Regions:
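Conserved short loop/turn motifs at secondary-structure junctions
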Residues: 60-63, 90-96
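N-terminal beta1-alpha1-beta2 module of alpha/beta enzyme domains
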Residues: 1-81
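Histidine-centered beta-alpha loop that forms part of the nucleotide-sugar donor binding/catalytic region
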Residues: 58, 89, 120-122
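Conserved catalytic cysteine-centered active-site region
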Residues: 80-88
């Protein structure tokens, strides 16, 4: 019996790139609407036949740079795409199971089955402080 394996490719998107100083690059448009940028990037990834896009999340500021909340962002992006997978992060440390299930079920319904969950636990002191722990 032969088995065909297929690699799945996803893009991990961040507003100004993955380097901590990427926001300082002269070509970086700090005034632009991040949703417009992400919509263009995700549509490009879809045209390139990538399987999914991924947005990380933190319940605290990362390097002092604000970020859009991924489930809201992915729900909006679902309306601008047709087949690319939409993966977002949610921590089980500070979210109740029912809430996470409801949020991802909503994204899955809105996107017609394209939702994915990056399940994480949190050990970040800044996140803990935001929850009084």
């Amino acid at each position: 019996m032969s088995s065909t394996k297929q690699m799945h490719i996803a893009a991990f998107l961040m507003r100004h790139g993955h380097h901590v100083a990427a926001w300082r690059h002269p070509d970086t448009d700090l005034a632009s609407n991040p949703f417009t940028l992400f919509r263009e990037q995700v549509q490009s990834a879809e045209r390139a036949c990538l399987d999914a896009v991924f947005f990380a999340d933190s319940l605290a500021l990362t390097n002092g740079i604000p970020a859009l909340e991924p489930l809201t962002l992915l729900s909006a992006l679902a309306a601008s795409t047709s087949h690319i997978g939409l993966i977002g992060t949610a921590t089980t440390t500070y979210n109740e199971p029912y809430t996470v299930a409801r949020q991802f079920a909503s994204l899955d319904l809105i996107s017609e089955g394209r939702a994915g969950w990056n399940l994480v636990t949190s050990d970040n002191a800044a996140e803990a402080a935001n929850f009084g722990r």
